[in-house]
Amino acid sequence: MNNIAPVITIDGPSGSGKGTVAGILAKRLGWNLLDSGALYRLLAFAAHNHGVDLTNEELLKKLAAHLDVQFIAATDGQLQRIILEGDEVSDVIRTESVGSGASQVAALPAVREALLQRQRAFQEAPGLVADGRDMGTVVFPNAPLKIFLTASAEERARRRYLQLKGKVEGVSLSSLLDEIRARDERDTQRAVAPLKPAADAIQLDSTELSIDQVLERIMSEIAIRDIAG
């Protein structure tokens, strides 16, 4: 791991906007991007495809260590593309059912350990923007800037509904809200690396903020710390 490259971590619950913010921020800075949540979603999706039970920690650990994954950076007018075993899965892994599976496998210590070094390997020059749930508390505890981004469950469900509407059949706002609340409980109550802000994190509630307003706050913190040079 390159200890020189700076890291900005953006943690928060599902639907808080951290992925969107992290992607735009990484592109603006010209830095690398780690979407750690995608790794857990990919593992849950791969487990389903291979018939691996989400409670089988040993098999999940082996699957995590050998995931055939490719991240293709976003370009103008296009979102980041994610390839699993040769197939593009960028949209399908964003469904709440896959997200629920990701939350289950993320609670398993052996799985988290298997993916830890894989995540840390993303820390390369000129810098890294890492988004997830334990980026600032576990994966990059020495990051010079840590953001914890949240929003009300209702607002997060609304955002996810707009994101999935037209892409996923049968999606409803009420079911998304129920799933988000259930996932919040799992993520905050798990024994290993529970979702919580780092002690030195800047906490931002984005319920009433636009993406641009959130980015403006973060860019101000970057300037104060002179992180990007």
Curated annotation (Swiss-Prot):
EC number: 2.7.4.25
Keyword Transferase: yes
Record key words, sorted: ATP-binding, Cytoplasm, Kinase, Nucleotide-binding, Transferase
Main location: cytoplasm
GO molecular function, one term: ATP binding
Gene3D superfamilies named in the record: P-loop containing nucleotide triphosphate hydrolases
Cell compartments where the protein resides: Cytoplasm
BP terms from Gene Ontology: nucleobase-containing small molecule interconversion; pyrimidine nucleotide metabolic process
Top-level EC class as recorded in UniProt: transferase
Binding site for ATP: 12-20
Catalyzed reactions per annotation: CMP + ATP = CDP + ADP; dCMP + ATP = dCDP + ADP
GO cellular component: cytosol
Aminoacyl-tRNA synthetase is among the record's keywords: no
Family under the similarity heading: Belongs to the cytidylate kinase family. Type 1 subfamily.
HAMAP family: Cytidyl_kinase_type1
Name of this protein: Cytidylate kinase
Origin species: Pseudomonas fluorescens (strain Pf0-1)
